Amino acid sequence: MSTDKKKEEVPKPETEDLTVKDETKNKDKKKANEEEELSEEDQKLKGDLEMLVQTLLEDDSKLYETTLTQLKEFIKNSTSSMTAVPKPLKFLRPFYPDLCKAYDKWSDKDQKSSLADMLSVLAMTYSDTHQHDSLRFRLLSDTSNIASWGHEYVRHLALEIGEVYNEQVEKEAEDNSTSTESSPQPPHMNFEFSKDVILQLSLEIVPYFMKHNGEEDAVDLLLEIEAIEKLPQFVDENTYKRVCQYMIACVQLLPPPEDISFLQTAYSIYLSELQLPEALSLAIRLGNEDMIRSVFDATSDPIVHQQLAYILAAQRVPFEHPELQEIIGNTKLSEHFLYLAKELNLLTPKIPEDIYKSHLDSSKSVFSSAGLDSAQQNLAASFVNAFLNLGYCNDKMITDNDNWVYKTKGDGMTSAVASIGSIYQWNIDGLQQLDKYLYVDEPEVKAGGLLGIGIASAGVHHDVEPALLLLQEYINHSDTKISTAAILGIGIAFAGSKNDEVLGLLLPVVSNTENSLELAAIAALALSHVFVGTCNGDITTAVMDNFLERTPLELKSEWARFLALSLGLLYLGQGEHVDDVLETINAIEHPMTSAIEVLISSCAYTATGDVLLVQDLLHRLTPKAVKSSDEDEDEDNEELSQEDMNGISAFLGKKENEIAEEPQGNEGADNEMEVDSHQDETTTGENNVKKEENEEEKTEKSEKTENDEEEEDEEESKDEGANDELAYAVIGIALITMGEEIGKEMSLRHFGHLMHYGNEHIRRMVPLAMGLVSVADPQMKVFDTLTRFSHDPDLDVSMNSIFAMGLCGVGTNNARLAQLLRQLASYYSREQDALFITRLAQGLVHLGKGTMTMDIFNDAHVLNKVTLASLLTVLVGLISPSFILKHHQLFYMLNSGVRPKFIITLNEEGEQIKVNVRIGQAVETVGQAGKPKTITGWITQSTPVLLGHGERAELENDEYISYTNNIEGVVILKKNPNFQEEE
């Protein structure tokens, strides 16, 4: 019995008690909430609102108007703080469905309109996703005072407008693509939203945003409804700056054609507000000559015209204006640069040893350079000297020593003489220095003189064009060395000039397919530099004819890459015009077709950040399954090899496996010989039979040799085309992503993966792509990675990594990079090609003693097409480093893209003046409230000064007023009449 009692006394499970406890807790909470909600003030408010709603739900229509007015007052008075849902909206929420039904019953138009006005606000708190009731009732209401409901309501309305518009666009697309069968619509779609009505409402909302510091919201709304061109009418002098800054920042993130329409709208706003330098920057970015003309026509002030001309000159944009031709033609560039050099005390010439610093190299011994070609190292010194003293018009090595040229040999003499042109770059006096070399017997020396004339005249255009007069008579010279040097010189001198006279001279050279491929390729390359980004149809046709008419054997040459590049440069930054050319190329049946297509599309969409195109390029770079070569002999082995090749590791290890297989085969042969030694009779019989068979096979083979050779040629050209495609795809990723910072970061991450998993052709290009993404921007993480790559077992990868280090630090004098390159020079002291590239990289880092840059963008985010074209030419040459080392004159293509990174201030008379400026790191101020600082960590200096990558300058005080907001290059200032000096 006791046990039974104990059993009965066992407590019930705790879960039952918990549920009871939870219920009591919930009841207590509800009571507490009710008490909280129903405080005296709230209870009175709730009672008043319920009474007003009941009045609306009754049939007495006379009271509706006053009741609605009272309700609206309650709501409006509560919306002063939007930290939480306003009490009236909270209390009215349960009545929303009843009020909607009441709206349907009412007949009076004015009363319905007034109720719809209120329901539109209530719908903010009640409406389910995709109902769009707020917008629906707003359109049903005739009242136009949207602003009275406050900022939160207007933003909610703008959000719904965007959603509805996108739904309509999708619906129209579906209607066009699918059959006419009507699909069942959700209930909220029964109300037809008219595009015109939505646009009208949006144009009422935009002015509200503009008045209440919501410029970004206004731009976003007009973007959603595809009406960004309507924006200028709402912008005034107080809002234009923030609006345009936001729009230009958005361009990198927009797909075409919206990016173009944003730039055009920002241009028209700047033009209407007479912000002409900013308008000109956008016109250059769009590449529209009519827009540039409109900027000049917008003012008659000659000083403003001069400032605009200096901006055009810096970007190498040709423009016909008789009074400004000297400035646009860069004829004063040398004068300004030498003024900078004098003020910074840099006129004393340097020699290559000043940057080699061989005396610091402790590991250097008597035997370290044994076996090195001294002529090649002298040639390297010529290049370093040319880059180091570029534009200074004096040096200690070549100009005063005529014998230096003969310390090099063969084609090296051409580059040695041409380096004089680099020393005298932008200065007409350089032509006199080079003239004597045109009367020498050696064709290499004469060719160097011609190339030097082109380099000395790079980007400088006089009325007479002396460089063209001197070079044109050598274009059709019988000696290829002389003719190619003259053509290359013209390409460097007239890069970006769109000179029709040059077109008339060089187009016949490209069109004549009887010329050697080298001559045609160099002529096409020169023309593409002169007409970079112009989509010139005549040059395009001439280059395409070369691809169609030349033999596969000719197109195997590395020069064919420069034909492909010339097409890419013609369409640089012209994504909207490239489709026709790509279609034509696709129609050609040739192994190089796919590679050319990749290069052209990458050039056309440069700096657009096009994610889909980058994905396509990455897809091309992923390893494919590789077919086994002995598939006819053994099917089982073929299956196994294909399975292995599907993995990335096996793909990369293909060569190692082949090498490993060879010794096994030899061992097997030895074993067979041992067995055969025991069977002499059988072997002799077999050998006799084999001899007879071999004789028969030889006769058959001799008949098939021609066909086999043709097939092999086709296969080789296919492989070369595929390899070039991979190389162009890697460069393409860098080209497309170089426009904005996030894209750069992502591309650098991808390059790391490609270096790890890619084949030899991909790995060879990855360092160059990394260098291209960060030209003149020596980030520690980038050049440390490149330093690691510079010790790669593949010497081509190492050389390209070293050159990429030079690109990263071009013109920066970066001490860390200089030290790394000195270490590499010591490491590769026995490897002459790698040492040559290392010397070139050292020359680039110290370009113009640190006063020059090859930065592809300026502070206004304008792409410098001439600079990019010069870099791409050398990078394409470095696909095969041995090729460009043999044709080292191509390195001088870099000279056309070099420009000083100075700030020089002039007064209105054009005289140089000294003004204090602050120089610091540029700060992104887009979308920030108030007037934030545009630079940080600044240092005050007196002009002329140097401006590094990512730096920005501003005037220290108001003593002078600048004619341009972007303080870079040559800036014209005027005295501020209202300036008062501080005591």
UniProtKB/Swiss-Prot annotation:
Membrane-spanning ranges: none
Any Pfam family the entry gives: RPN1_RPN2_N
Keywords: Proteasome, Repeat
This protein's GO CC annotations: ascospore-type prospore nucleus; nuclear periphery; proteasome regulatory particle, base subcomplex; proteasome storage granule
Annotated stretches, region: Disordered: 1-44, 169-188, 625-644, 662-724
Biased composition (Basic and acidic residues): 1-26, 688-705
Cross-referenced InterPro entries: 26S_Psome_Rpn1, ARM-like, ARM-type_fold, Proteasome/cyclosome_rpt, RPN1_C, RPN1_N
PC repeats: 415-447, 448-484, 485-519, 520-557, 563-595, 768-799, 800-834
Bias (Acidic residues): 630-642, 706-718
Family as reported in the entry's similarity comment: Belongs to the proteasome subunit S2 family.
Record function comment: Acts as a regulatory subunit of the 26 proteasome which is involved in the ATP-dependent degradation of ubiquitinated proteins.
Protein's UniProt name: 26S proteasome regulatory subunit RPN1
